[in-house]
Amino acid sequence: MKVHKGDTVLVISGKDKGAKGKVIQAYPKENRVLVEGVNRIKKHVANSANQRGASSGGIVTQEAPIHVSNVMVVDSDGKPTRIGYRTDENGKRVRISRRNGKDI
């Protein structure tokens, strides 16, 4: 998967189209990423008392994973780009921007 944790991405389709956010977590097996502030859902959490006696529960708003095909990585210029790979002088694979050829 070409999108990694910490990347800034732009949502290109879906209900949050046009939103930018930082990837909080990547799920390579499911081809999904968790993006900060994008695809927010309301989750109903049961009441539970913690050790100090305070109860927590109710309706909680949180982010849900979004499919990786619905996001594009934003490069250093602030524009969305596709990702390519090249090998550096040490033989390691480095991600590059397909738009301008710079390292990401």
UniProtKB/Swiss-Prot annotation:
Compositionally biased tracts (Basic and acidic residues) = 82-92
- Show the segment(s) annotated as Disordered: 82-104
Keywords from UniProt, A to Z, are: Ribonucleoprotein, Ribosomal protein, RNA-binding, rRNA-binding
**What is a single cellular component term in the Gene Ontology annotation?**
ribonucleoprotein complex
Give residue spans, biased composition: Basic residues. 93-104
The Gene Ontology terms for molecular function here are: rRNA binding; structural constituent of ribosome
Q: Which cysteines are joined by disulfide bonds?
A: none
Q: What role does this protein play? A: One of two assembly initiator proteins, it binds directly to the 5'-end of the 23S rRNA, where it nucleates assembly of the 50S subunit. One of the proteins that surrounds the polypeptide exit tunnel on the outside of the subunit.
Matching NCBIfam families: rplX_bact (TIGR01079)
Instruction: State the similarity comment.
Output: Belongs to the universal ribosomal protein uL24 family.
| Protein known as | Large ribosomal subunit protein uL24
Q: Which organism is it from?
A: Nocardia farcinica (strain IFM 10152)
Per the record, the gene is rplX
